[in-house]
Regions:
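Pyridoxal 5′-phosphate
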Residues: 1-404
Length: 404
């Protein structure tokens, strides 16, 4: 069997890592990969048509998140760059105007695209504080209220929905607390986009990060929403593209595709929630009922529609992923950006999980492309693989004997 054949027969349950590019998105991108190749900075016909395409895409992003103007949208190379721009650009600007504002508050379960820029800012003299979370991955607003009383906080950055366990955070309430203390608020909404209705005005956020490939768009493009009249510094310097905040010739095909993906996501968010959450709930019900010593992690209700995160006791998660892949299931133990580093999940550690609980964890994330039949097949395979792995474990017979 070729890799292509295996690809066609596999069941893809890893949409938290990336999503298939929608056919409508591909169709909209193609002309900008072929005959519409002008540089948007050029003033001739070829440049003008690519500029118009970027403007349309910017409008579509604006509409998806309920922004006030397309001027509030800055295109980037993805969610990671958007987070870096938000954190570093804001921190450096605020400190240049108000040197005493040198603290950044975030949570202990943020993506590395937030945690690593925070570490970099620490090297530049900033102080970062990581809020604790509950054993369900929830940031209590009271935790923020308790530590933000001093007027030295430049920025609070809390993700809208967690990429591993899917927990949705009370962003609106957290924003109010931050603003009362004179701090700006950024949210990494990479996992929330397309799964939740987004409205930056209702949430009150000052900045919001987005990524194309999480909403059935192409990889290598994202955006940062920056509230009107909010000033931040660029972290990439050059020709002054993207409102002088992100220099470099724009990735026109990617931006066009991202814009179309935003338009589709905005139209289909209700359909997405109904279809995907229905499949997810069915999957969770079957797993917990049919697979012994299994547990769902994260909040039951306040979680994004596509996410199901489990711990299977006395099973090694990496062995489980490999066996599932061999049996036609694509899944993950957690963040795709951390898996290749072979490090334990900092998210699960922050939630108080033991070593056994962390190593026995599995994330299944669904999409619009999945069907009930695929879920049934996946659960059947998962159950069989877990049984096989447990039988091979030297500790299983001892456990069974102890349980009588």
């Amino acid at each position: 069997m070729t890799d292509d054949d295996e690809h066609d027969s596999h069941i893809y349950l890893d949409t938290a890592a990336s999503t298939p590019v929608a056919e409508e998105v591909i169709a909209e991108m193609l002309p900008y990969l072929k005959e519409r190749y002008g540089n948007p900075s050029s003033i001739h016909k070829f440049g003008r048509e690519t500029t118009r395409a970027i403007n349309l895409a910017r409008k579509r992003v604006e509409e998806m998140i309920g922004a006030s103007s397309s001027r509030e949208i800055t295109f980037t190379s993805g969610g990671t760059e958007a987070n870096n721009l938000a954190l570093k650009g804001t921190a450096m600007y605020v400190k240049s105007k108000m040197p005493k504002k040198n603290m950044i508050i975030t949570s202990s379960i943020e993506h590395d695209a937030v945690l690593e820029p925070c570490k970099d800012l620490e090297d530049r003299g900033f102080v970062t504080m990581h809020l604790p979370v509950t054993d369900e991955g929830f940031v209590r607003p009271s935790e923020l209220k308790n530590v933000i009383s001093d007027n030295n906080v430049a920025l609070v950055s809390i993700m809208y929905a967690n990429n591993e366990v899917g927990t949705i955070q009370p962003i609106k309430e957290l924003v109010e607390i931050a603003h009362q203390a004179g701090a700006l608020f950024h949210t990494d909404a990479v996992q929330a986009a397309g799964k939740l209705p987004l409205n930056v005005k209702n949430l009150g956020v000052d900045m919001m990060s987005l990524s194309s490939h999480k909403i059935n768009g192409p990889k290598g493009v994202g955006a940062l929403y920056i509230r009107s009249n909010l000033k931040i510094l660029p972290i990439i310097h050059g020709g002054g593209q993207e409102w002088y905040l992100r220099s470099g010739t724009e990735n026109v095909p990617g931006i066009v595709g991202f814009g179309k993906a935003c338009e589709l996501a905005n139209k289909r968010v209700g359909q997405y929630q109904e279809h995907v959450a229905g499949l997810r709930n069915y999957l969770v019900e079957r797993v917990l009922k049919e697979i012994p010593r299994s547990r769902l992690n994260g909040l039951r209700t306040e979680r994004i529609a596509n996410n199901a995160h489990f711990t299977f006791f006395r099973v090694n998660g990496e062995d489980l992923i490999i066996k599932l892949d061999e049996n036609g299931i694509a899944a993950s133990t957690g963040s795709a950006c951390s898996v290749k580093k072979q490090k334990q999940s900092h998210v699960l550690k922050a939630m108080g999980f033991s070593y056994e609980e962390i190593t026995g964890s599995l994330r299944l994330s669904l999409g619009m492309h999945n069907t009930k039949d695929e879920v049934d097949r996946a659960v059947d395979i998962l159950s069989s693989v877990i049984k096989e792995l447990r039988e091979l474990s030297p500790f299983e017979s001892k456990y069974v004997a102890e349980m009588g």
